[in-house]
């Protein structure tokens, strides 16, 4: 006998009961153990930062990471689901700096020391928020928290060391001087994709955009006009660049002669001038100019060029004068300087201050020097014009300090060498939505610079390189290899312990220390497929058993971040895609369309809504929304709440009706019973059920939850508003046709069981509650995915039922237009059809008569008819 069901269901209370049942009976563990070890479906979870608090974004990412493992488990696959924590990097360091009252990187070493600072970082990341488990439980996600890996674990860090070694040996890693984004507060390079992840990492400002006069060395009163947005960088200008293909002019204005690109004459002051010469840019190449500041002249080595005009295709006439200043603090600038043999001078220290040896400006923060440089050059008659330019500047993703481009002698992944392979392997990946594949992701790969993977910080995996002054390097790929080379037992790979490990140079015999940098934490994230399993050191599984993983999912910001670094490392190590299928979610914005922020007060508290409406409603809301098609949405409590009114209560009411009358009629399912009903409603709903099985299966396999939710909603609506509505008189004490009653209960029971299975990945709590009462089985999540039964599919019957429902809908509309209430019976209705063959059988006519409360149906044929009347 079924347990009684209340029509007034409290979904959050029900979910608490289900959670307790799952934990007590270890249903999650059984769902894994019940599947064969030799049939695996793998997914890789991007670990959140260990001390961060859950929010709608993390919940959004977590939900599909539960949906698809549930689906593939029911399909018969063993799905490993282990949680992970991201521990290293600036998020922890910045928090510890604040807790210790430190205001700069320099104070870390001077005031507290690296050892204490690292100890504080370890303590900080050990404080795992208990909130995480509450949230993950209450959105219905199954995951192994007990065996969670951490990126700070020795085993994880050893695999990262191995990954570095593999890439280094394949000549994909090099050390060199290149320009990258730099944070003067954190005193470290910042990855360009870290900034690109979030629009809040950019700030709109109005900045300097000045035109400077550089006197040509051998031409009297002749200046070349150069444009720049960085006055602080004018302190060191060892070269100017022009475009050889552009046409330049020499003009005479106010007794001085100026050279600039002809298309930029509008940049001249509003003073009369005349053009006295016109020539191609090639004529300017090699000419010398007088520098504005000469303090670094003694640093210029023999063979190096300085104060010379060079050519560059990167110079355009779109902005400025067609002439740009060249210094080491620009990617194209530095590349041109290396190519032309220009002297490289760096005048900022690691905190963004001008070095003390620089006259007039030494010790100033670089931005503070802007105004003083402009004033000095203006006083000396070298500032032609000063303008303002509104533009967007990047900010540090952790401390929000304004970034600048700076030359870094650092460790890089040679993306240019890898790029053809990266583009090729992307073709093998299934992206959903598909437009990201050759759209945003491919474009990010095509435009990617070499990746700076070293950081001038402390809390992270070490750059595993011991570099001798003679140039020899030792790059271990394992702890064992390092122990053998050093003779020291390794218990911790963190600073400062790792910095005390010495090895002997095989070339010259000197004692060698490790280079001081740590690795970008993104290389740890990109190594997750291997490092979470401590591959290749614990060979419990073959590589092909887990790599590339079948599935990953994150929001659009990870296209240029986690997806990208996974792709780079997968291609570099194995010339393989790093994942087979990727689901890209959109972003959940606040109610006002801005990023969700406590300061804005523009979003409802997720915990409060989970307690109020439950986890299934949140899952339905998000899984059925455009956010699962990579589009951004505004958070809406109303849309969240509407899921209860929609699918959930609709299904519950059908279930409640079935249980109520089954108890009244003392009906119980019979083992092995087959449904051979002749009732057209039973045949129709079972035929439609097979279409639902087919469509949901295909949509799950294509990672399209929006279609799954839509198909479930449509079917449950048909079940409630047509099948149950038209079948109410088939059950209960007044229904005397026992055969028909048995058919109804058997059909309804079969349909509800199947719906529970199909919806289990979407609404795991509701499906579990219903399924456990319908069956004697332990859990719907331990059952097998339903197979489509083509024998009961009847497309002609479905077409006739659709026609029937359309007629009914039209009839209701006519009643409404004419203000005729349904309870008022009508003698007859007239239905005009185009062909006699469209006339429905008596069974369908009976449905129309009962639904529209009419006694007789009259059919009329009109071959010129466009639609049924």
Give, region by region, the residue ranges found by the protein language model:
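Active-site-adjacent bridging/hinge elements
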Residues: 37-45, 67, 104-108, 133-140, ...
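Structured ligand/cofactor/substrate-binding pocket environments in proteins
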Residues: 57-69, 76, 85-86, 151, ...
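Short, polar/flexible loop-turn hinges at active-site or ligand-entry regions and domain interfaces
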Residues: 102-119, 431-434, 607, 628-642
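Feature 926 captures the class I aminoacyl-tRNA synthetase adenylation module centered on the KMSKS loop
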Residues: 211, 443-523, 527-529, 535, ...
């Amino acid at each position: 006998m079924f347990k009684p069901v209340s029509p007034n269901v409290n979904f959050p209370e029900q979910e608490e009961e289900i959670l307790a049942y799952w934990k007590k009976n270890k249903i999650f563990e059984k769902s894994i153990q019940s599947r064969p070890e030799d049939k695996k479906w793998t997914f890789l979870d991007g670990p959140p930062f260990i001390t961060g608090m859950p929010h709608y974004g993390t919940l959004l990412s977590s939900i599909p990471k539960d949906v698809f493992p549930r689906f593939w488990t029911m399909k018969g696959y063993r799905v490993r689901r282990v949680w992970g924590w991201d521990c290293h990097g600036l998020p922890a360091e910045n928090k510890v700096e604040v807790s210790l009252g430190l205001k700069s990187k320099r104070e870390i070493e001077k005031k507290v020391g690296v050892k204490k600072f690292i100890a504080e970082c370890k303590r900080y990341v050990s404080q795992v928020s208990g909130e995480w488990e509450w949230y993950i439980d209450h959105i219905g996600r199954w995951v192994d928290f007990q065996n969670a890996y951490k990126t700070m674990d020795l085993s994880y860090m050893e695999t990262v060391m191995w990954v570095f070694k593999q890439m280094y040996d394949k000549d994909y890693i090099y050390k060199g001087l290149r320009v990258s984004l730099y944070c003067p507060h954190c005193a470290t390079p910042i990855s360009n994709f870290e900034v690109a992840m979030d629009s809040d990492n950019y700030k709109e400002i109005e900045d300097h955009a000045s035109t400077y006069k550089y006197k040509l060395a051998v031409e009297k009163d002749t200046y070349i006009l150069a444009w720049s947005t960085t006055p602080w960088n004018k302190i060191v200008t060892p070269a100017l660049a022009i475009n050889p293909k552009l046409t330049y002019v020499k003009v005479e204005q106010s007794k001085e002669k100026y050279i600039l690109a002809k298309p930029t004459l509008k940049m001249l002051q509003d003073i009369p001038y005349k053009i006295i010469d016109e020539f191609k840019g090639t004529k300017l190449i090699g000419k010398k100019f007088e520098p504005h500041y000469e303090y670094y002249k003694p640093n210029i080595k023999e063979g190096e060029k300085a104060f010379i005009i060079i050519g560059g295709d990167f110079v355009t006439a779109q902005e400025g004068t067609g002439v740009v200043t060249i210094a080491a603090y620009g990617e194209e600038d530095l590349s041109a300087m290396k190519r032309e043999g220009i002297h490289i001078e760096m005048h900022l220290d690691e905190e963004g201050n001008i070095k003390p040896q620089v006259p007039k400006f030494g010790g100033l923060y670089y931005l503070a020097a802007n105004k003083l440089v402009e004033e000095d050059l203006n006083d000396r008659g070298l500032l032609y014009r000063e303008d303002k330019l509104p533009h967007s500047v990047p900010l540090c993703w952790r401390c929000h300090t304004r970034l600048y481009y700076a030359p870094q002698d650092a460790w890089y992944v040679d993306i240019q060498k890898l790029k053809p392979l990266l583009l090729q392997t992307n073709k093998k990946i299934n992206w959903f939505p598909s437009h990201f594949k050759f759209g945003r992701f491919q474009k990010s790969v095509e435009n990617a610079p070499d990746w700076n993977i070293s950081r001038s910080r402390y809390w992270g995996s070490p750059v595993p390189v011991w570099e001798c002054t003679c140039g020899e390097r030792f790059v271990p790929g394992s702890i064992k290899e390092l122990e053998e080379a050093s003779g020291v037992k390794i218990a911790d790979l963190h600073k400062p312990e790792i910095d005390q490990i010495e090895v002997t140079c095989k070339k010259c015999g000197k004692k060698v220390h490790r280079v001081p940098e740590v690795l970008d934490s993104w290389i740890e994230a990109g190594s997750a497929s291997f490092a979470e399993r401590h591959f290749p050191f614990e060979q419990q599984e073959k590589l092909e058993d887990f790599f590339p993983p079948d599935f990953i999912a994150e929001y659009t910001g990870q296209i240029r971040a986690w997806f990208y670094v996974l792709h780079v490392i997968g291609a570099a190590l194995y010339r393989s895609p790093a994942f087979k299928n990727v689901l890209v979610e959109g972003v959940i914005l606040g109610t006002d369309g801005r990023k969700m922020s406590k300061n804005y007060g523009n979003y409802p508290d997720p915990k409060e809504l989970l307690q109020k409406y439950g986890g299934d409603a949140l899952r339905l809301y998000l899984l059925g929304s455009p956010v699962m098609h990579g589009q951004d949405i505004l958070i809406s409590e109303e849309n969240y709440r509407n899921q209860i009114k929609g699918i959930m209560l609709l299904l519950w009411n059908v279930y409640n009706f079935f249980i109520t009358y089954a108890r009244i009629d003392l009906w119980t399912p019979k083992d092995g019973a087959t449904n051979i009903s002749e009732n057209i409603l039973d045949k129709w709903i079972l035929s439609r059920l097979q279409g639902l099985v087919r469509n949901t299966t295909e949509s799950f396999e294509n990672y399209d939850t929006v279609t799954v939710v839509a198909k479930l909603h449509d079917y449950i609506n048909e079940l409630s508003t047509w099948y149950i509505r038209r079948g109410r008189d088939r059950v209960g004490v007044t229904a005397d046709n026992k055969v028909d009653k048995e058919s109804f209960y058997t059909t309804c029971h079969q349909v509800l069981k199947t719906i529970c299975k199909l919806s289990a990945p979407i609404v795991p709590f509701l499906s579990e509650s219903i399924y456990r009462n319908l069956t004697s089985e332990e859990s719907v999540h331990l059952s097998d995915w339903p197979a489509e039964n083509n024998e009961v599919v009847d497309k002609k019957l479905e077409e006739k039922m659709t026609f029937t429902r359309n007629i009914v809908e039209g009839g209701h509309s006519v009643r409404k237009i004419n203000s005729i209430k349904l309870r008022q019976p009508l003698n007859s209705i007239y239905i005009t059809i185009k062909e006699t063959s469209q006339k429905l059988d008596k069974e369908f006519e009976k449905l129309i008569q009962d639904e529209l409360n009419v006694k007789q149906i009259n059919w009329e044929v009109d071959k010129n008819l466009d639609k049924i009347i």
